[in-house]
Amino acid sequence: MNEYSLFTSESVSEGHPDKIADQISDAVLDAIIARDKQARVACETMVKTGVAIVAGEITTSAWVDLEDLVRRVINDIGYTSSDVGFDGNTCGVLNLIGKQSVDIAQGVDRSKPEDQGAGDQGLMFGYATNETDSYMPAPIHYSHRLVERQAELRKHGLLPWLRPDAKSQLTFRYDAQGKPCAVDAVVLSTQHDPDIDQDELREMVKREIIEEVIPAEWLTETTKYHINPTGNFVIGGPVGDCGLTGRKIIVDTYGGMARHGGGAFSGKDPSKVDRSAAYAGRYVAKNVVAAGLAERCEIQVSYAIGVAEPTSVSVDTFGTGKISDAKIVELVREHFDLRPNAITRMLDLLHPMYQLTAAYGHFGREPFETSYTWTDVGGKQHVETFTAFPWEKTDRADALRQAAGL
């Protein structure tokens, strides 16, 4: 039985100030990792009225036109004019990038890649549930889809009065079996042009966004709708609020349904276990649930800086396991190598896939094949193919099921 009769999660659009910062940080990471797979990247961004500040520690042999990159990200989101609150063409870009500390580097780098130490101490969680096809909790899954739909309508000109900044929040009702059965409340706030009538806005948002995203059987007569509940939302983006990398860690993960170790993802290369171990945790948990070993699974993994082997691995299936949690831990250790370098190899993480993750959730996305081209120092071009969102694969579920004897 689920602990909650009601549960709420929220999401924000790609035009939310904090998400602008996340996307810039991950665009910098992508640009570098496409050229230098040995790079160390920890990139933080702040955006506020008329300025984007990029700071952090980066050690790389690659060169990136950071100012041009920042402007392209901002423009691609839709901030192309001061009329909408931010202009990627004219904003100031301040570069405060330094190099990684030699003290950190000596704890991470090893002559044998498999002995690579964790980039920091910390604890990370992975989670999966069978309540949706994406193996994600319904509140966060559909909250993401609402703001994703808002961006789709805006970018395709179907609701041309929409602007980039938006937030969603969903309260789901759960039944006695712990399954989502209805939406109790919908909150959707979207930035808009000043000349749109609020009644028209609410009608169109309800019809074209909410009812297009949420299954009809979950929208009942008692569902409450709060669409732009404060009225006008003309001023948004970095004018309305300062945006910072790493400020939406619950939006990025499981919407509060699972625990969080506290480390943000964006702007960090895979040597940072804050990111790579959280991805591995999702991979493990999703395969455990897909294998039918449990209906819900949360895994915790922890590390010490400079040490390759995790300091702990634990599993909680919340009473839904078909075998004991201790047995699942044994299977996890047998089928998944959770040392930092092994995670990078297992999930093939040294590719420019990270800006894709920086809006609408790092988890619950469909993995897909894509490619990119890079040029070496001799001027030769190379094409590499990789899987985006590789931690969403369920390719180890069969092996886990067989090993569990199910």
From Swiss-Prot:
GO terms for molecular function: ATP binding; magnesium ion binding; methionine adenosyltransferase activity. PROSITE patterns: ADOMET_SYNTHASE_1 (PS00376), ADOMET_SYNTHASE_2 (PS00377). Homotetramer; dimer of dimers. The keyword Cell inner membrane does not apply. ATP binds at H16, D165, A166, K167, D241, R247, K248, A264, K268. NCBIfam families: metK. Its EC number is 2.5.1.6. Belongs to the AdoMet synthase family. Mg(2+) binds at D18. Its cofactor is Mg(2+); K(+). Residues 100-110 are annotated as: Flexible loop. GO terms for biological process: one-carbon metabolic process; S-adenosylmethionine biosynthetic process. Pathway: Amino-acid biosynthesis; S-adenosyl-L-methionine biosynthesis; S-adenosyl-L-methionine from L-methionine: step 1/1. GO terms for cellular component: cytoplasm. Catalyzes the formation of S-adenosylmethionine (AdoMet) from methionine and ATP. The overall synthetic reaction is composed of two sequential steps, AdoMet formation and the subsequent tripolyphosphate hydrolysis which occurs prior to release of AdoMet from the enzyme. It is found in: Cytoplasm. PANTHER family: S-ADENOSYLMETHIONINE SYNTHETASE (PTHR11964). The gene is metK. Signal peptide: none annotated. K(+) binds at E44. This is S-adenosylmethionine synthase.
